[in-house]
Structures are given as structure tokens and as C-alpha cells.
């Protein structure tokens, strides 16, 4: 049985006050909740504060980050390395998010290098994939997802996916209020798992595949009722302790 993972991507949001209030509230909301891994990815400047607040709350929350470099040190202004992230206890690292791919011109191949470097450093990639609205309307969703995943498989082998998390995020559903139906999301998740299974069934069976794209407390149970949806990568709703905890509780309930 795959253990669900619900992760909050805070993106470029936060202040010291907000981080303290959010994590304190989340620690309280998650009291007694079992059967789900709950992670947060604050902006880099707040990872230190988040680490301390998570520890004060009894380490019920996993600390993550929103990006990494493909070097551990050197003349790379503005970047942060896996070694630095580990130093602050961050383990679940988002890579390949559509906003990074679009605004920072990150290619499939570059994202694959990040994936491999995280694994090499003992960290867990949260590997984002997904299609644009135009690609969706053209019926290219499965092909786009396969291309993005194959950038890792072709370079490092299907076994590289062991212990990783794949986050399917249809780009047209991120921050728009639109969302794929639970049935449509399940169809894509099943196709992703089948594509991996064609290369290695054991790897496909254990890999966590999250859904992301306007996941809210109101629709979370419908997603988690699907057999191939193993959690969620949550944006806006993760900035509210009650809403984010409700999504985590839905995962624990539906995957029990």
C-alpha cells in the first residue's frame, strides 16, 4: 500500500509572522492525524524558521523546498544546493514545476539533472510534470507526461524513480480555479503508472503520483478515492492551516 503524501507549495508567499502562524496552526490541526505524510515547501528564506517551528510542534510535518541547483557549492550566484537543504532538514524538494519551466526556461533535460543530483544527495525529488491547456485540448497529455518522465528514465534508468514522487499538475489548472475531474485525473495517473510499468512493474507499483491543480477541501476526497492518486501537491489552499489540514485528513481517510 502506497502511503499518501500531501505537500504544500507556498510559492512566493510568506513573512515571518505568516510562517509562524501557519505552522503553529498546522501543528495543532494535524494533532492525532495518521496515515498520511504532510510536507511543506516554504520560500528559501523561511526554511530555517520553518525547521524550528516544525521541531517545536513535534515534527509532524516534513520540511521541503521549492528548488535546488545541480551543484553543491561554487560560483553559482543566487542558487541553493542539496547540501544546504539537508543542513536545514529539508528532504522533499520540488523540481520541474511549470513555473520554473516557463519563467526560468528549465528544460526536461535540466530537470532530469536536478532529479539525479537530489537522489545522489539522499533527498526525495517531487518531480512535477503536466501539460498546457493547448496540449490538453490537442489530446497530447499522455505524450507530454511521458516525454517529461522519459527525460529521467532515458538518462538514469527507470530505477531512478524508486523513492521519488511524481506530481501531475495540468498547467491549465494551477491557480486558475479550474481543475481536472477526479476521473480525468485518475485516467492520466493510470497512464503514467502504466508507462512506467511497461519498463518496470515493481517501480511503477511503489511510485507516489500526486495530483496538483486547484485541490481544495471540497474536492480532495473525490481525488483521493481514485486508486492511482496517491496524494496532492497543493498551492493556494496550503496557505491556510485549516484548509490544508482538511486536505491531509481527506487523504488519510480515503487511503486508510
Curated annotation (Swiss-Prot):
It comes from Vibrio vulnificus (strain YJ016). GO terms for biological process: gluconeogenesis; glyceraldehyde-3-phosphate biosynthetic process; glycerol catabolic process; glycolytic process. The gene is tpiA. Its main location: cytoplasm. One of its GO terms (molecular function) is triose-phosphate isomerase activity. It is found in: Cytoplasm. Involved in the gluconeogenesis. Catalyzes stereospecifically the conversion of dihydroxyacetone phosphate (DHAP) to D-glyceraldehyde-3-phosphate (G3P). Substrate binds at residues 9-11, 175, 214, 235-236. This is Triosephosphate isomerase. InterPro entries: Aldolase_TIM (IPR013785), TIM_sf (IPR035990), TrioseP_Isoase_bac/euk (IPR022896), Triosephosphate_isomerase (IPR000652), Triosephosphate_isomerase_AS (IPR020861). Gene3D superfamilies: Aldolase class I (3.20.20.70). Pfam families: TIM. Its EC number is 5.3.1.1. The active site is at residues 97, 169. The keyword Isomerase applies. NCBIfam families: tim (TIGR00419).
